[in-house]
Design a protein with these regions (language model features):
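Structural and coupling elements of P-loop NTPases
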Residues: 1-534
Length: 534
């Protein structure tokens, strides 16, 4: 292990790398854009810097995202704010694309959980929260849409604690909701923040702060609102959890903030507090033990995402890497652990969704994209360390929907195979071939059915291949853990299907849980698992 320099250590201390998670339509992408607005990365929410119109969300770059108004892939966004270098991983909220979100959370050091004030904790929030708790990363809560009718504040806090099993500590407190929403009260400074009109939230607005005991407060909120605020704060101070930075760092206490991302209420306040409370890059688990970025001087990174055709003109493939330790320099040679050889990382880029910027240096905590000629896979480790190591793999989640896929034009077989393989390598779909049939028959597995639509759209628009999908009755897939199992001799129910994945690993498809149990009973020692590993 080489010694880390003070310069590199100081650069890493500035990094804040976090993911934003939520149920669909809770306002996650809007909050992301407001962070970019306050960080100066965009002039106006909804538009890339220099563009004139607010037509699409900055983080929604794929054509299908713009057409449907949903996020279907994680976006990587970097900007500077108040001395910090911020890497935001904006994740798709739609449940059909949750696997991309799971992988993205592996690259984050903390998470911002966005909750709709009128709905509280929703199904997708629960799923994503579980992944965060598995990694023991800090979780910060932004309760959004306070400018609309909202649940009672105490009910919202109870909902988070009861549904997710995490203690909460409100850092600020809302004054009213819906049409009566006036702003937020900061519990530490005892000041009320009143927000002015900000052109429907597209530009930064002035933040007016007034002490709760200042006579001017009566011009801004009603007597009843002030009385209700004082009563609620007294109750919260007496019965609520106190702020504890250590518990926050362990992911056991979630600081809570209230606001409205659409109108900018509470956004910059949240960003300022969050950057102070959250963590700089954390140690990562490897087969050599934890790799601490504050001690490890060698460069190391892992691939958490692969994206083809981000620029249709270039027809390229970008591997997104989370730098875990050390300093990255353009053109450096690193050892690719899974490939078993050295590779040169040339033309490194940092992203603003699909916009690219060539870089010469990056540090632990940063997310970079490098050109991938087809050698990288999700979960791969790269390092310059002499004492080589491999970071823990990224789980592959079991698909729940399956279809046989064929190209309409048999003359386009080559484009079809290339396209479906590239999309599978991104992790957007999983492809399987029936045992002993080769690539003639391809079965696609997805976590959510909307991914079939995305597959069809992308093959047609990016590879000029039209496909037909034949839905299959299978609902369960299991990886075979025993390497010694002979697939030819394995017996199961009549509706079980034997398949192999891209790496040649044997798997079994089942129509129901009874079929799984029967197959295990008929094959002594057979071990099946729901999760593969990259």
């Amino acid at each position: 292990m080489s010694q880390i320099t003070n310069e590199v250590k100081n650069q890493i201390k500035k990094r804040r790398t976090f993911a934003i998670i939520s149920h669909p339509d809770a306002g996650k992408t809007t909050l992301t854009e407001k962070f970019l607005l306050y960080g100066g990365a965009i002039n106006q929410a909804g538009s890339v810097k220099g563009k004139a119109t607010a037509k699409h969300a900055v983080s929604d770059w794929m054509e299908i995202e713009k057409e449907r108004g949903i996020s279907v892939t994680s976006s990587v966004l970097q900007f500077n704010y108040d001395g910090y270098c911020i890497n935001i991983l904006d994740t798709p909220g739609h449940q059909d694309f949750s696997e991309d979100t799971y992988r993205t959370l592996m690259a984050a050091d903390s998470a911002v959980m966005v909750i709709d004030a009128s709905k509280g904790v929703e199904a997708q929030t629960r799923k994503l929260f579980k992944v965060c708790t598995m990694r023991h990363i800090p979780i910060f809560t932004f309760i959004n849409k306070m400018d609309r009718e909202a649940m009672d504040t105490f009910e919202l806090l109870d909902d988070i604690e009861n549904e997710l099993g995490i203690a909460t500590c409100p850092i600020n407190w809302p004054i009213g909701s819906g049409k009566e929403f006036k702003g937020v009260y900061d519990r530490a400074s005892k000041k009320v923040e009143i927000f002015s009109d900000t052109k429907k939230g597209t530009t930064q607005g002035e933040v007016k702060k007034v002490d709760i005991n200042d006579p001017e407060i009566f011009w801004l909120i009603t007597d009843d609102q002030k009385l209700q605020l004082e009563e609620e704060i007294e109750l919260q101070d007496g019965a609520g959890a106190e702020f504890d930075q250590e518990l926050v760092s362990k992911g056991e206490l979630s600081p809570v903030f209230f606001g409205s991302a659409l109108t900018n209420f509470g956004v910059e306040t949240f960003l300022q507090h969050f950057l102070q409370m959250t963590t700089s890059p954390l140690p990562r688990i490897s087969d050599r033990g934890p790799i601490d970025p504050m001690e490890e001087g060698d460069f190391s990174a892992f691939v958490f995402k692969i994206q083809a055709n981000m620029n249709k003109a270039h027809r390229d493939r970008i591997a997104f890497m989370r730098i875990c330790s050390g300093e990255f320099e353009a053109g450096m040679d690193v050892y690719h652990m899974q490939g078993g050889k050295k590779v040169r990382l040339s033309q490194p880029q940092q992203m603003m969704a699909s916009e690219r910027k060539m870089i010469s240096k990056a540090y632990g905590g940063d997310i970079i994209g490098v050109f991938d000629p087809g050698i990288f896979s999700i979960g791969d480790t790269l390092t310059t360390a002499q004492d080589k190591f491999t970071y823990e793999g990224i789980p592959t989640f079991a698909p729940e929907h399956f279809a046989r896929v064929r190209q309409v034009d048999t003359m386009k077989r080559k484009q079809f195979i290339k396209g479906i393989n590239q999309i599978a390598q991104e992790g957007a779909i999983q492809i399987f071939q029936e045992y002993n049939t080769g690539m003639e028959e391809i079965i696609v597995g997805v976590v959510g059915v909307l991914q079939f639509d995305v597959l069809k759209y992308r093959l047609e628009n990016e590879y000029n291949v039209e496909i037909r999908l034949e839905n299959l009755p299978y609902e369960y897939i299991r990886w075979i853990e025993n390497e010694e199992i002979d697939l030819d001799k394995l017996t199961g129910t009549s509706d079980m299907k034997k398949v192999k994945d891209l790496k040649g690993h044997p798997l079994l498809l089942f129509v129901n849980e009874w079929s799984i149990r029967m197959t295990i009973d008929r094959n002594d020692g057979l071990k099946l698992t729901e999760f593969g590993r990259s």
